[in-house]
Amino acid sequence: TEKNLGQRAILSNIRKYCSLTQVFQVFLIWRRKQLSDMKAAIKTADLPSKPVLLRAIIAMSYAHWEGYVRTCANRYFEHLALRKKPFVEFERQIYVNSILGRLDALYRGRVSLEERCKIINDILDGGDGRFSYLNPDLVDTRSNLNTDVIKDICMICDVDSNHFEQNRTFLDILLLKRRNAIAHGQQEYIQTDEIDDLVAKILSLMGFFRNLLENKVYTKAYAANNSLVRTLVGAAQAPCDPIAHD
């Protein structure tokens, strides 16, 4: 019956959503555990070892921040690409993404005249093809995932970046500037009593980015002509596997 078909469609959508949620969760669990183990090691370390471990947890926190954002973004696009739907069934940004990498190659003069003509024709055709692949260079953390870079990644994913802008001081100064100083062998003094808040904050930002993508999938805000949902997606609540923070 029509009712049963509708119920099956809803269940199918939940299964697809939860499968992506489970992937996100798996990649988060081991990162959270490593940070938790490092915090425990710092608290029980002897005085000479503590400064080394404090510097290490800054580098580790940044590494997990960068790695998790990149993983979530790539898995999100893989999730959409597996549908092999026409570009016209997705929000405009999906089609824009398909052109961006090719435009970069065009700008750098690495393509033939034939390929340049093809790029222009593809743009003029308005997305007649299917979305089945994302240029991996687009989700580029630049080994320097500061506020401006995460905003670019949010643009590629077509999600709101305001929350990260509001945390610019934490990302760019308390995390990234310190990480860069440590990576270049400079002295950087970290206080033991700030580690709990720092780790909780980075896990919160990782979880926030994950939720932005999960909510888009659950509400199908990635679909064409779904602008109302996209305006509400930031307030949507994920129905599966809520993130627990340390």
Language-model-derived ranges and their functions:
Residues M60-S61, Y68, C72-F164:
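Helix-loop junctions and short alpha-helical segments
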Residues K50-A63, F90:
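Alpha-helical scaffold segments that form or flank carboxylate-/histidine-based iron centers
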Residues Y62-R70, N74, A200, S204-G207, ...:
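A broad, structural surface signal
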Residues F24-Q25, P48, A63, G109, ...:
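Helix-centric, low-specificity signal for extended rod-like, repetitive segments
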Residues S36-R55:
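A long, hydrophobic alpha-helical segment
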Residues G6-A40, D148-D246:
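Polyanionic, low-complexity intrinsically disordered segments
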